[in-house]
Amino acid sequence: MTWKRLILALPGGAPEDLSEAMAADLAEDLLASWTALWHPELIHQAQTIPEWKRSDPSALDVEQALVLVPKASQSLMETTLRERLTVLESEAIESRSDRLSTASAMRALLATRSPSTPSACWDRWQDEFFALGFAYWQLHLIIRQLRYSSTLNSVLFQEQLLHAAQAVAKEDEAEAERWLQSCFDQLAQERDHHFAQAVHLIDVVLLHRPPDDSQSKHLTSATHAQFWIGDFPQWISPDSSGNWLESIRENGQIDLAGGGDPLAVIPWLEESFALEQLAENRQIYCQHFGRAPEVYATFAPSLHANSPRQLLASGYKSTLLLDWQAARYPQSSQAKIYWEAPDGSCIDAISNQVIDAAQVASFLHLGTRIGKQMDYHQVPTLLLTHWAGQSSWPMEDLLRVARRSPLLGSWIRLPEYFASTQRPYHQERLTASKFPKQPLPVDGSQLAADDVRWSVQRDMTAVRNLSVLLQQLDGWLGRQPLPQVSYDWHWSDDTLKPDPTRPQVTAELGSNDQETPASPSTSCQPALFLKVGRCLALSWQEDAAITARQPLSRVAREIVPAARRCIEGLRDRMPHSSDSLASKKRLFLVNPWSGPRRLLLENLPLQAVEESESTRVYASHSHSQGDQAVVDVVVDVPPMGILQVSDETRVIKKKKLPLIAREPGVLGNEFIEAHFDLASGRLKGTYAPNHRGNRLSGMLAVRLPEHGSGGASYSQMKATGMKLLKSNPVVGRILFQGDLVDGSTTLGHYEIEYSLFRGSRVLDIAVHCTGLQLPAANDLKHYLCWRTAWANISGIVSLWQHGTKTTMPTGWSYCPSLLEIDEADHREYLLPNGLSRHRRLDDRFLDSLLPIVNQEGAFWFGIGLDLPRPRQTCLDHFAKPFSIEESSSEMQTGPSAWFVQCTPSHILVELVASLGRPGEPPQGMRIRLQDHAGRSTVAAVDLFRKPRKASTIDIAGKIWTDLVIEDQKVKVPLKAHESAMVDILWE
């Protein structure tokens, strides 16, 4: 006699009662046991639909039933219960290691009780019936999650199921297919009865290396939509295997994630470098895959608060706001969001609802996840993620269900998904404070590489500004043509070296505008610029920090002659007076930034200089160095301008000024006054002249390991000597020497040099430590730091990351370019100059982690007070003067001239490229404007040449809006934190 019922003994009353925290092995066994009951031979013999019951005597008081007991229920099946089942002519069987083994065991047991109908189709159709059982389980969870009761016509469904099993037994393929499809259709109708909206399923495949031939064949043979995430630009080389590339080109169901190196995540990286990297990666996609990616996603963290602006500018239409390494991105209440950046830029994104398709346990409650999407989300979306070739068997069940019915959702390509859900739905503004703190490796080589990385990108931006400016002057003064298009321009000799391995891509600048030039001159962004981007990306990788510092240092050395050639070119383009003394000593200075730059020039081999508004000399002091007369001078170089400082032999009356080092332990000028503790050498306080109250203090310290329940403690500074290195009305410099001590234990030795010059609002601090006794292992609880404290606990602490000012949270922050403490009357600033790890403690303390290599370290940073242009100051204050000595005649225009300036002063302007066709004079130039203060404004860009037309553009050169030109000034409306690209054409 055969069984009349097929029952799964659950550890709870129903599937919705099962804990989502169930152990993975128990969850896998439970799902495998349920679907194994749906084997067509079992259904055909029992002539019934499988069901579930609670594992207790009252629920399992059933006759002539096969009771399958999964691992989760075996402890509940007491001996008395098993004996009761035997009395009722029922039989309990425990699950096996996997689904097929469990089904085989039940079939074998069935054969001992009742001979079954032999059929060669049992095994061929078993997977389809398993998928039907999987769908039945998930539908129940969906309905219960939506708080409904099932209205499924069980009698009709059972009849259709039995017809399907009967057809399989008779080996009638057509009938089996027809009746099985009817079962799926009836389940889909039941689902639509409660919720008819479509559910979107997205298969995300992660790849950590290029797929080999077998893996590529398996992946590309799939017929459903897939989205691959990997470092594709790095995997493509001239000798790379083209099998997987060809497979992707032929398979229209596979889309690749745009991205590559996570360069854009470096918070202090200038936006131009990030945009250049994004554009270069897209060109690689176009060349090798035949289409540019529309969706941006990388495996490593690569998104930040301003990513929508950069991605839209680079041609991307959407992104995945997902971090596959850890849940560090901000999570939205909706799966599909319209992500708004601080500057108002918006991009479509998916922010959560990821299912690990490699874990069977993820599918036990899949229906509950789908039900929540239907209940709470405007666009029901599920991302099923797995490494290539590592999906679990329920994923195959889901694929079979989706091929037959949209019951559990439909697979969709990501570009189609975003195109069909373009309406904003849920718009969410994600500020920088909501984004996670980045990984904080504290390896000394990584920290030291940060310093070089900062200086390289800063100096490279300055040199590019100079190179574009030089091309503009060539075209304006001498009608010189632009160089031929090349992707390799060696700075030292201007030799054009075409690279045949690089794709020749021309960016179109306009739509139907006949006045728009053909393209920006790509030689304005030579190989040196591209090399900087690659080195910066390499140095971001923790395991490459040591090796990356070497190419970064080489690039830094290449920038020096590049800058000198630009300065010499600018000097030679300036008209000089023929009647002035050519033998007179002069210094030619260039300012590559869009705001005026105040510079200290020490020990110039000049007799004296004239202090006046016309000469741009703010202060000077003549003295002797050995047998030679020298002068210390403070000058103001005009914005993106030039200045010629000339030797003055005649006697000049100067206003007597007080010394900068006016008394022991004090440096002061007209803007800031710093007091130092003579016993330790620490910065005791900074003051605004004629204002009471200490604004800021600081000290060098070693954070000591915590002991017991008490808080962390710090070492103390013990000065062993003090030297007044320099003191005159222009500059003052004090050196403290001493030991870092913890009680009677010496932890290291230090030298701290404080310096301040006339007219400066920044106190320079240079620290050199030796003999440090710190653990070799990385430790965020025991480190060397500069410890900053401020007096006002109500001060608002902010930092700049990715060009955006945001409130600094408590804890670690990574790579801020600038930190601000905003009080009611004053603003204090910490200028890190490459110090990348900062930890805010309590309400008024800050630890800035200092890099150590081989038990010693050297670093230079600054403290500012009431900076008028804080963002530019953190760039230009630590850069070396762009200057050359010359003996040519005076310039006809006077000692100074400017070329580009902008108001208001907090707007930063960069020169991106010259516009025009190779071999012709430049027709215009492309500039970038950035607001770093978080204030909407209309920027007025004043130019050295009369503009004819100006337009804002995207990264591909497509014109967005035409701009107003008034009095030779281009008016550019900017929203808070916005970065705008502008093309300017000359008359």
Indicate residue ranges for each PLM-predicted region:
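Acidic-and-aromatic substrate-binding clefts and catalytic sites of carbohydrate-active enzymes
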Residues: 207-211, 231-239, 296-304, 324-330, ...
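Active-site and substrate-binding clefts of carbohydrate-active enzymes
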Residues: 2-210, 333-581, 588-592, 636-638, ...
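Acidic, His- and aromatic-enriched active-site or binding-groove loops in soluble protein domains
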Residues: 242-258, 309-330, 340-342
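Conserved short loop/turn motifs at secondary-structure junctions
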Residues: 230-233, 263-265, 293-303, 384-390, ...
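Loop/turn elements at helix/coil->beta-strand transitions in domains of secreted/extracellular proteins
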Residues: 63-64, 220-223, 251-255, 289-293, ...
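CE4/NodB-like, metal-dependent polysaccharide N-deacetylase domain
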Residues: 44, 50, 58-63, 272-314, ...
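C-terminal (or distal) subdomains of carbohydrate-active enzymes
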Residues: 307-312, 335, 504, 508-515, ...
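Metal-dependent polysaccharide deacetylase catalytic core of the NodB/CE4 family, i.e.
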Residues: 220-300, 345-351
